[in-house]
Amino acid sequence: MTKILALVCLIIFIFILGVPKYLGPDDLGKCAEPAAVGTCQVADAIVVVSGGDTNARVQEGVTLFKQGWGKQLIFSGAAADETGLSNALAMKKYAVKLGVSEAFISTEEFSRNTAENAQNTSRYIEQNNLSRIILVTSAYHQRRASLEFSRRIGDTVQIINHPVAQDRQWSGYWWATPIGWWLVVGELGKIGIFYIAPEGTI
């Protein structure tokens, strides 16, 4: 009985540690600063998708931009309330407030979910011949967002993942909160659907 209990505890421990690493890949994690070659190269654009703690995502994107990681910012997201400002425009306004010139910001205002974020933003990427982007979203959402963007962009554009490590909904103590478990179960389920369902469903 003791061995079974120890095994169960070990499995839970590995799950708690492993889930954040799986859901939130960070390709820039080992990069101290932009470099001329490799994963740490400057990107053509920093793409930030709305949802969850959107302000935290904008802050992370703006920080990367100010540090010289990308040449422009692209914000993607429709209006949460169809009578109001789109998420993308609200994100743009916040970025300008944080000190970014409008000249370096583009918006995509029609995406209602992650699949549409990828589909609609990919058009802009293709039309402007971008070859390398940094994708920013919440840590729990990074894996699925990357899968959706990879599906629609293909091998022609390099996608560099960089999640917001911690925000109002997610932290290293995700397992201690109901919303943490809700996000994990939801994301793992949606990733499963991604592999078996038609495109554009989530």
Regions found by a protein language model. Name each.
Residues A176-I202:
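A transmembrane-helix-recognition feature enriched in membrane-embedded lipid enzymes
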Residues K3-V19:
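Hydrophobic membrane-insertion alpha-helices, especially the h-region
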